[in-house]
Amino acid sequence: MQDNKRKLYEAVSHIVDSERKNLGIKYTDFCLGNDIPTSTYDDIINANRQTSFYNIAKVVKALDLSFAEFGELLDKELPENFMKEDA
């Protein structure tokens, strides 16, 4: 299960960083413009530790994504059958 947690954090990290770059927004400008501490953003993009849902939600909204859009990106990023229990 620990491995799945890591995969999830890494998927969130990749999506957040890619979407910010796709918008052409510099790291510091993104954080300052959306009142997101750089340490919080660092934790998310480096998949360093569990980040609160509030902080992830704040970043998702700052990226101008709906939660549905973010979920779709997450589904594409995660391996097939990601949460399926072993039989």
Question: Where do the language-model regions lie?
Answer:
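Short, charged recognition helix plus adjacent turn
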Residues: 1-3, 71-87
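A short, Lys/Arg-rich alpha-helix, primarily the initiator
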Residues: 1-23
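Residues within the helices of the helix-turn-helix
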Residues: 17, 28, 39, 57, ...
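The alpha-helix within a helix-turn-helix
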Residues: 20, 31, 60
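DNA major-groove recognition helix of helix-turn-helix
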Residues: 20, 45, 55, 74
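Short alpha-helical DNA-recognition segment
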Residues: 23-43
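Short, basic-rich loop-to-helix N-cap that marks the start of a DNA-contacting helix
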Residues: 48-61
